[in-house]
Amino acid sequence: MVAAKAKADWIPDRQDIIWIDCNPQAGREMRDRHPFLVLSPRAFNARTSLVIGLPMTTAEYNADNPFALAVGAAKGAKAGKTSYVLCHQPKSFDWRIREASPHRLKRLPDSPFFEVCAVLNQIIQLA
């Protein structure tokens, strides 16, 4: 009962890494359940049920992609592979409907998170 309550109270926050189902997808968009780096703040995510962020992958072809930022080594079944944040694929998802859940990595450390934001800003040029 306590675990169910904890999950019911959970709301993703900026810098969290979560699991989310990216389906449906089209073209070169990511599909299926993947890690996702949250960019939007907890208050926004709670109020709107949306989460804005970037998908993550261990697909090796991203090593040559200037917009895929390597953020460390994967763990678990993907141990030994590099984790990439796909800065060129910002997305918003209804995290409640898609039954998002916390990823075992929990949160991206400050330094790589700031690098991800800098690469994203090179693309969308907010500031």
Protein language model features and the residues they cover:
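Conserved functional hotspots at enzyme active or ligand-binding sites that engage polyanionic ligands
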Residues: 1-127
